[in-house]
């Protein structure tokens, strides 16, 4: 059975207060002066003090083979802050640190280890505050107002490096080859790792490591590094440094899912909801010039306009990509929302998903069998549900303690206001009719004979995304739905968590003393007219799921308060994020893909045209990470997702999967 949690570090603290691994019988850092050793070996060995001021790009990427207590990262972060203070006009503005850790410390052990270095306390406190739960895969932490990005990959580095997407090739400016000593942890120090380091290293990229072991030096040389010995720190005689001087040929392992970015830094986003708002922020942070075209007279008038939306992950025992994406998207969303400098109504009160019939009970039992971290999801027995949620349901279920609700409309409006302060230009009542290539740019034609020309375009306009010739064949569909707004009652006011059943019910929003209950589901419909049938069905589903609950029968929908919207969805419940694929060219180029995989060309796409769509009913959970993924792809920066899960987000995936099996593909 696939496990979705990571084992924490098994450690103790010695007499000097230094953490020691029980499994590897080795210290995490030197008893003498671990901080100075880090500065000497990794910062000095990679000549960062000299390279930072001369770096010709706005981003410097460093990768590390063992995160441990984070000493290397914290020391580097402090040094980077000092560099930026001394060189405010330097080209280099942001730091990206990628690290792998098989056995992450608990937050408590991390804080205890950090007490060793009071001079690093301001940086350590930020790291501890965002320390992720023990889930496999990549956890992106945005630190220091997003000037510093930390990608923590939890799992075995020799397994993870084979799961990295090709887009990470030749991105790393410097390697910190760290970890327990080769004699203590020989399984990590492999030729497989050395080869992966070479594949990821940028031409001219460097490496440094504390060891001078001969097999390490020879292995790195075989991988392509030019190696040399340097005086070791303190009592250690020697250490190793290296440079990637040659450019290695790097064939794409899965060209049909290849992602391409853009050399340009000017973009038009078509939208007006949560997707376009969060993407605007992510691109502005990377130095893009961003314009947003919204068809409505104000933002969040479409699917992002609800008063309350639930935040919790979508999990399934039988879909690894779904689990990997939504579990990491959920934890990223919580970190992102918690540090977002805008106000919006929300309450991280928890979400409880109830087994109201045999089918839903079986589904929950399967989720609970996946060895999920307790921080993510825990079982709740029927007799405990009332205590946790505040209302009696006579059902058992699964609770997401870090979930809750937020106001999507308010979030979208205020994020866009923040983005405007950072340079975003917004044009309201601009309905895009069509777009076409003109002189290496995109010509946008709007209703009313308005036109605009932009270097890059992102379509983030929800269910309207397939209305253009370039996107008309996308396998997405519309879902119309109605959310009912109901006044609270004395019993409903006791509801402390979001309830999910064959619908959902939120606790009251203190701002208006109303709850949200929903939502109806009409696949293929774009009708946004109020429906009395939907209003009654929202109430009836609640009563049907909890027939013994008197509070459910007291729900009042008679005032006809509701909101209707239309979502964009896919049959595999995953978003579509990336290049807009060229349908006709895909069918031509991949006509014989099943028999000729080795000869496959890169995925046919429209140049400088991207999409961010099909968020379905989980946009609040998926949008923050999707925005980060797309902004990173467009900017040719490291993407926080493994290759197979990233492929599951590719807009061409449903076509390519059929073509790989030699099956016919139909549009739409």
Swiss-Prot record:
Protein's GO biological process: methylation; tRNA wobble uridine modification
InterPro entries: FAD-dep_OxRdtase, FAD/NAD-bd_sf, MnmC-like_methylTransf, SAM-dependent_MTases_sf, tRNA_MAMT_biosynth_bifunc_MnmC, tRNA_MNMC2, tRNA_S-uridine_synth_MnmC_C
GO cellular component, one term: cytoplasm
Record EC number: 2.1.1.61, 1.5.-.-
Region described as FAD-dependent cmnm(5)s(2)U34 oxidoreductase: spans on this chain: 270-668
Catalytic activity field: 5-aminomethyl-2-thiouridine(34) in tRNA + S-adenosyl-L-methionine = 5-methylaminomethyl-2-thiouridine(34) in tRNA + S-adenosyl-L-homocysteine + H(+)
Coiled-coil parts of chain: none
Alphabetically ordered keywords of this record: Cytoplasm, FAD, Flavoprotein, Methyltransferase, Multifunctional enzyme, Oxidoreductase, S-adenosyl-L-methionine, Transferase, tRNA processing
A molecular function GO annotation: flavin adenine dinucleotide binding
Cofactor: FAD
Segments for region (tRNA (mnm(5)s(2)U34)-methyltransferase): 1-245
Subcellular location: Cytoplasm
Annotated function: Catalyzes the last two steps in the biosynthesis of 5-methylaminomethyl-2-thiouridine (mnm(5)s(2)U) at the wobble position (U34) in tRNA. Catalyzes the FAD-dependent demodification of cmnm(5)s(2)U34 to nm(5)s(2)U34, followed by the transfer of a methyl group from S-adenosyl-L-methionine to nm(5)s(2)U34, to form mnm(5)s(2)U34.
Family to which this protein belongs: In the N-terminal section; belongs to the methyltransferase superfamily. tRNA (mnm(5)s(2)U34)-methyltransferase family. In the C-terminal section; belongs to the DAO family.
HAMAP family: MnmC
Protein name per its UniProtKB record: tRNA 5-methylaminomethyl-2-thiouridine biosynthesis bifunctional protein MnmC
Species assigned in the record: Shigella flexneri
Encoding gene, per UniProt annotation: mnmC
